[in-house]
Amino acid sequence: MKSYKLLTPGPLTTTVSVKKEMLFDHCTWDDDYKKITQEIRAKLLKLARVSAGEYTAVLMQGSGTFGVESVLTSVIGKKDKLLIVSNGAYGERMGDIAAHASIPHLIYRQDYDKIPDPSVIEMLLAENPDVTHVS
């Protein structure tokens, strides 16, 4: 079989050592698996500099779009408004997700090969004081 380098977004091309580790079937009820999961969750809270008494980390499996959609549809409330800074496919997809989920939003579009201008973002925030979230 021919070996390919996958040049698409995401961690698709993996090393032999990672592939070998993936050959082992982990069960969610195994103590080793639970220990690994709890360590990851604790490290995420530490990374975010928040207390386990007030916050938790939920590990979710899915594509990048799945992760973005899960955040947009669970963090942004009905009275909130989202400013999407879009200079690529993910930004455009966030606009689609926000529209489909009836999330109040506005989009600052920039060409795919350009860096969004911070002064434009500042202006949009000043003109739209009801914006509560920026992505």
Per-range role (PLM):
Residues 93-104, 122-124:
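Active-site-proximal loop->helix
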Residues 54-87, 91-95:
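Conserved beta-loop-alpha segment that forms the PLP phosphate-binding cup at the N-terminus of a helix
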Residues 2-48, 52-59:
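A glycine-/small-polar-enriched, mobile loop at the entrance of the PLP active site in fold-type I
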Residues 116-135:
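Active-site phosphate-binding strand-loop segment of PLP-dependent enzymes
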Residues 44, 71, 121-125:
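Generic hydrophobic alpha-helical segments
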Residues 76-81, 103-105, 130:
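Short, surface-exposed connector motifs at secondary-structure boundaries
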Residues 59-61, 108-114:
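Short beta->alpha junction loops
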